């Protein structure tokens, strides 16, 4: 039941953020999380980190090896 609620919450967050201006990207991690970024994430090839701005406008980083898939949301 908790897994279903988490999936529904992630979908709702994705649709809510897709209404914002600009291109948003969704990153699916290896541990099952879904991260929605505001704008296109930047990959640093030297460090292997992906930098992105989260839904609250805070800059975040995640290791590239932790990201399974990254796709642009359709507007």
UniProtKB/Swiss-Prot annotation:
Domain of life: Bacteria
Pfam families tied to this protein: DUF903
Lipid attachment in record (N-palmitoyl cysteine): 20
Subcellular location: Cell membrane
InterPro entries found in the cross-reference section: LSM_dom_sf, YgdI/YgdR-like, YgdI/YgdR-like_SH3-like
Signal peptide: 1-19
GO cellular component: plasma membrane
Membrane topology listed for this record: Lipid-anchor
Covalent lipid adducts (S-diacylglycerol cysteine), residues: 20
Keyword Membrane (UniProt): yes
This protein's record includes keyword Transport: no
UniProt keyword annotations, A-Z: Cell membrane, Lipoprotein, Membrane, Palmitate, Signal
NCBIfam families referenced in this protein's UniProt entry, alphabetically: lipo_YgdI_YgdR
Family (UniProt): To E.coli YgdR.
Name recorded for this polypeptide: Uncharacterized lipoprotein YgdI
